[in-house]
Amino acid sequence: MLHTPIGRLRTMGFIEGMSLLILLFIAMPLKYWAGLPLAVTIVGSVHGGLFILYLLVLAYATFSVKWPLKWSAAGFIAAFVPFGNFLYDRGLRNYK
């Protein structure tokens, strides 16, 4: 899966999506229910870095595959919609 630009994009999308799940369902409850705001600081920073990396991998895939602009635009929009990258991944799986 990591041998193609689309495979790398799908993998990065999954990792970035999982970091959002960890942020929402583990770090946020730790902050508000257990009084540990550092959890959100750490996980939020990691998620932000992964988000930027996802956008870089999207740009790499766009120029490597030379696919239509709609795929790049959809990936960019999906990056800003919570859990949108999981829906985008379904489309990428069918794109191959």
UniProtKB/Swiss-Prot annotation:
Keywords: Cell membrane, Membrane, Transmembrane, Transmembrane helix. It is found in: Cell membrane. The keyword Membrane applies. Its main location: membrane. GO terms for cellular component: plasma membrane. The chain crosses the membrane at residues 14-34, 38-58, 67-87. It comes from the Bacteria. InterPro entries: DUF3817_TM. It is a multi-pass membrane protein. Pfam families: DUF3817. This is Uncharacterized membrane protein YdzA. The gene is ydzA.
